[in-house]
């Protein structure tokens, strides 16, 4: 059981016999009336996101989730294959288990996979990863028609928007939660 003061992003709750992961939450204390917590919950099975409001101080059942450190091995065309770092056991996770962040997976990358009752719920990448730019067009000085950014293809095949000064071969730090460029990494 968890109190609403224990809420944090990533916490998995058991609501109506469904596992719901907190994606976003906000404590609200209105001028009149009791405080409450507004949340966005993602169903870990279907991926559906819903809004739910809890009164402050309410106890909510948490799911017993086991997070394991794993290494991403490869993509077999239908699944991401990961290996448990302790037991060397391999697991096949469907693409949707990593969500949009899956496009930033590189072989031998360290990831965390959450399990409940022996079943893999979802995988998480580090908050930021360093990836090399495979291709980008040269940026034209003074070109501000698209906000000072241009598309770049990364070594994983993902395409993101980067500043005009980025060149092919640069290594970039990417936020895996949003898919945004953070900085250029010195080689």
Swiss-Prot record:
Keyword check for Protein biosynthesis: yes
GO molecular function, one term: translation elongation factor activity
Pathway info: Protein biosynthesis; polypeptide chain elongation
Location in the cell: Cytoplasm
Record-linked SUPFAM superfamilies: Nucleic acid-binding proteins, Translation proteins SH3-like domain
Cross-referenced InterPro entries: Elong-fact-P_C, NA-bd_OB-fold, Rib_uL2_dom2, Transl_elong_fac_P/YeiP, Transl_elong_KOW-like, Transl_elong_P/YeiP_cen, Transl_elong_P/YeiP_CS, Transl_elongation_fac_P
Listed transmembrane segments: none
Any single biological process term in GO: peptide biosynthetic process
A GO cellular-component term linked to this record: cytoplasm
Keywords per UniProt: Cytoplasm, Elongation factor, Protein biosynthesis
Family stated for the protein in its record: Belongs to the elongation factor P family.
Job of this protein: Involved in peptide bond synthesis. Stimulates efficient translation and peptide-bond synthesis on native or reconstituted 70S ribosomes in vitro. Probably functions indirectly by altering the affinity of the ribosome for aminoacyl-tRNA, thus increasing their reactivity as acceptors for peptidyl transferase.
Protein name: Elongation factor P
Lineage of source species: Bacteria, Bacillati, Actinomycetota, Actinomycetes, Mycobacteriales
